[in-house]
């Protein structure tokens, strides 16, 4: 690990503005440090007090943390609650007529629902699910466009104790099939099509394809929401959403579940083949969502209009669209489209139109919008903004400064948030009224999060020295296991080399002299493309499944917009392709990967070689491939290479 060096030096510091501090939920550094001291002095008491303060319990818990079967930690497990009740019912008396969701459709049209209306719709859909035999513990796949209905489907599952597994609408039929099969889903909720940038994307067709790919006899019904009115094939198991719900009652008693009951499974890319079904709990997850909204987003339910641009298919869309904001009774924007349709000012127009106060998006989106110039956002009134956030990958200091100056007018704090699908909620991020920010750093851990940078054995490393990012104590919102694979869970996140109880994030990081964390990248072979985690093994497997391909290796290289670009090295079964033939085959392989996994995984460039650089023991020299992809001079020892002559071939990229 000593080989990890930190080359990023950033010295600018932005203390919170006094006007922000005076109104902040956590006001000033002393208040932040007091929370941290409280957590260190009485760890269980700290979390128990917060859980009692912020969550409505049907049966109060008496046990806070059970570590007897570490690392399978249990939090508040004798308490009973319902997440949907906490997001909807508890607001009805005081906020029933308040707008809950503002749906900004792809074409710019707007629909809104109040808390009362959202509650009624969730109850109707929950009753519909019950009428189809769905109950506590059953798995429901949600393969939906960004919509009010996607949130309704998730909340309805939570209401009856069913376990949802949302699959991003951009994933292919094959990816969907793998998730249906692994979760043994009883029901699928989908739509005819999604609308994105003026184009219709068929979802029902992909669901039909997925269901025809293998043994999916576990699926009893497919509920279809009519989004576009596009043509769909129909079978006996299919049912329209509107027909299912129109006769259902608008009340549905919540099913009270243990705090440890699984709320959802969300699949994330692994560094080896099969996607990992990250399983989250009910009570601990909800607490993480609530606290991070209050602490990191400084949430003010009465005044804020909150907008997180993430799709519900990702963890960000779970915690910071479907659950966190609603648990606090906030008004939020849900966005169907893309930042540049029907025009390049769409994001800024949306902020101005709905008077958005808190805006949370990915560095990828920011970088792509920077390219369009600062004059564009200047055409819109962004004065309603008071807080900006970034998620999905580290933000480079230049993009941070543009975001701060051009979008935030130099007055909005930026919360650069580090967390993962597996952590459920923010882990390291500035509390905006307390912690001074530095462009490019996610700053300091949230109170109660015992984050550290260590060597491969869990030992300390010097300040400024790169190491493994770990969390030393269990925390309420962390994943409980990998669905159906407890051994992989232990091996991946709680390795024996670190004592079996320390959470290994899989990221490398260093801390500066102020203790601030700087994320340096993945320590495994997972790429971060536009804030989406993609396993290199999955892309390699997709390439090799093409009849032309004998062998493939995939690496990432820095990309100024997407964070990382996908670079594929391919050995064909026939002769090495060159010229126009290489371009044609590269195009075919890109489309192939898009069909197998999804468009997000398509290689940005493909390089053809007679073979791949391997050591004499047959191991692919990935470090060498990364250096070639980045255009770096090869300084490492290539004496163990079986065929050094191929290096020149691999330098020729087909874009």
From Swiss-Prot:
InterPro entries, A to Z: Ac_CoA_lig, ACAS_N, AMP-bd_C, AMP-bd_C_sf, AMP-binding_CS, AMP-dep_synth/lig_dom, ANL_N_sf
Q: In the Enzyme Commission scheme, what number(s) does this protein have?
A: 6.2.1.1
| N6-acetyllysine carried by residues | 619
What SUPFAM superfamilies does the annotation carry?
Acetyl-CoA synthetase-like
Q: Which residues form a coiled coil?
A: none
- Annotated CoA binding lies at 196-199, 316, 530
Q: Which cofactor does it need?
A: Mg(2+)
PROSITE patterns per the UniProt record, alphabetical: AMP_BINDING
Give any Gene Ontology cellular component. Answer: cytosol
Q: Which UniProt keywords apply?
A: Acetylation, ATP-binding, Ligase, Magnesium, Metal-binding, Nucleotide-binding
Catalysed reaction equations from the record? acetate + ATP + CoA = acetyl-CoA + AMP + diphosphate
Q: Where does ATP bind?
A: 392-394, 416-421, 507, 522, 533
Write out the residues that bind Mg(2+).
544, 549
| Molecular function via GO | acetate-CoA ligase activity; AMP binding; ATP binding; metal ion binding
Kind of enzyme, top EC level?
ligase
Any keyword Signal?
A: no
One BP term from GO: acetyl-CoA biosynthetic process from acetate
Tell me how the protein is altered or processed after translation.
Acetylated. Deacetylation by the SIR2-homolog deacetylase activates the enzyme.
Sorted alphabetically, which Gene3D superfamilies does this protein's record hold?
3.30.300.30, N-terminal domain of ligase-like
PANTHER family according to UniProt: ACETYL-COENZYME A SYNTHETASE (PTHR24095), ACETYL-COENZYME A SYNTHETASE 1 (PTHR24095:SF14)
Protein role: Catalyzes the conversion of acetate into acetyl-CoA (AcCoA), an essential intermediate at the junction of anabolic and catabolic pathways. AcsA undergoes a two-step reaction. In the first half reaction, AcsA combines acetate with ATP to form acetyl-adenylate (AcAMP) intermediate. In the second half reaction, it can then transfer the acetyl group from AcAMP to the sulfhydryl group of CoA, forming the product AcCoA.
Stated family: Belongs to the ATP-dependent AMP-binding enzyme family.
* Protein name according to UniProt: Acetyl-coenzyme A synthetase
Which species is the source of this protein?
Answer: Thiobacillus denitrificans (strain ATCC 25259 / T1)
